[in-house]
Amino acid sequence: MRRQLRSRRAPAFPYGYRYRLDDQDEANHNYLADEEEEAEEEAQVMMVPGLEEEEEEEEGKEEEEEREEEEGQGQSTGSAWWRKLQIVNEYLWDPEKRMSLARTGQSRSLILVIYFFFYASLAAVITLFIYMLFLAISPYMPTFTEQVKPPGVMIRPFAHSLNFNFNVSEPETWQRYVISLNGFLQGYNDSLQEEMNIDCPPGRYFIQDGDEDEDKKACQFKRSFLKNCSGLEDPTFGYSTGQPCILLKMNRIVGFRPEFGDPVKVSCKVQKGDENDIRSINYYPESASFDLRYYPYYGKLTHVNYTSPLVAMHFTDVVKNQAVPVQCQLKGKGIVNDVINDRFVGRIIFTLNIET
């Protein structure tokens, strides 16, 4: 450190200034004060002769520390990933504490035991409640029968998208329908029905009293009831002559009985277009209805041999070489057949396209 000594020159007075004794005393007093201050500063410098060198050394050290910090930042960026890998490795396995994933083998075993007993207790409670629930529910009769919709319908033979397309002169186009009908009607063979079921009087419900777990008897529905659509008189079910047979059945509903003792009937017509496209339909049985003797249905557990009644539609005179949309509906009291969102409740729509 370099010190600048103040000038010892006497103070200058302005031009024309008249010298007075008081002014001289004041100037002398200021001069002596400056001299004392300079003497004190020189004494401090003499007492600490290496102060300037120490200050320079401190400044040099600060510069070196700044350079080292800059170099350390560059090196820390390269070694950061290595430190992270070391931390992960110690977390996976710490050989000093013999811990893996921050847990010892003993603590893991204890946790497994706790979870085992917890889930075992939970499973036991759930099983107990399910068992009690099944004790309160009858397997033979549905609990909420009022939520069941009116019966839906299905047809046989099975047809993709409910479109019956075939050529009378090409058996390979309609043979699959014949095979489907023959397979479906095997359970309706007369000999099998006479062996398993009983002959019930028509026109009234077949109500069977007794315990709900008691086996129920079923009424016969013979294949011969379908006459020209039974496959007994015409093995091709009319497909070889362009007069196809289609079978319709209602879905089974436990406890269902047609209201007011009137049987449910079937009616088919052109769904959209010229009504004369279908000029003649024969129904089998001739009443075109599901007889009351097949109701009520008691469920598959007790009504083992129950056979669903059928109604066959024999389309004897249908316009050829064009698609004819057909709608078959169930009709009776309590039957719903106009649900827009479900075309299988009380009705079904299919297409006939018979080529010659």
Swiss-Prot record:
The chain crosses the membrane at residues 110-130. Keywords: Membrane, Nucleus, Signal-anchor, Transcription, Transcription regulation, Transmembrane, Transmembrane helix. May act as a transcriptional coregulator during muscle development through its interaction with SNW1. Has lost its ancestral function as a Na,K-ATPase beta-subunit. GO terms for cellular component: nuclear envelope; nuclear inner membrane; nucleus; sodium:potassium-exchanging ATPase complex. This is Protein ATP1B4. Residues 33-43, 51-72 have a biased composition (Acidic residues). Pfam families: Na_K-ATPase (PF00287). Residues 26-78 are annotated as: Disordered. The gene is Atp1b4.
